[in-house]
Amino acid sequence: MAQTLNSYKMAEIMYKILEKKGELTLEDILAQFEISVPSAYNIQRALKAICERHPDECEVQYKNRKTTFKWIKQEQKEEQKQEQTQDNIAKIFDAQPANFEQTDQGFIKAKQ
């Protein structure tokens, strides 16, 4: 029971690291805590459970017997920033010229 609680606490730490880093693997868990492979698998299982409770924040991907944890919210924020930038660029290009005219003396004034 103590090992389970300890693994879960370590998984919570890895969850916070995942949020900052954006992606984690078993190797990251091993490097972070300098533990044995079986202990790292216990932490990985606990981290999977945490991700299952927060599907809008974390995603577990499996490829070639390798488990990767990905932080989803960060990707969504980057996509939203890109969309906002594209919208701003479109607004700039779609903007109508200001209602100004140049006077005989070279000054610019608003059209009336």
UniProtKB/Swiss-Prot annotation:
InterPro entries according to UniProt: F-112-like_sf, SSV1_F112-like, WH_DNA-bd_sf
Q: Which Pfam families match?
A: F-112
**Function of the molecule:** Essential for virus function.
Descriptive protein name: Protein F-112
Q: Write down the species.
A: Sulfolobus spindle-shape virus 1
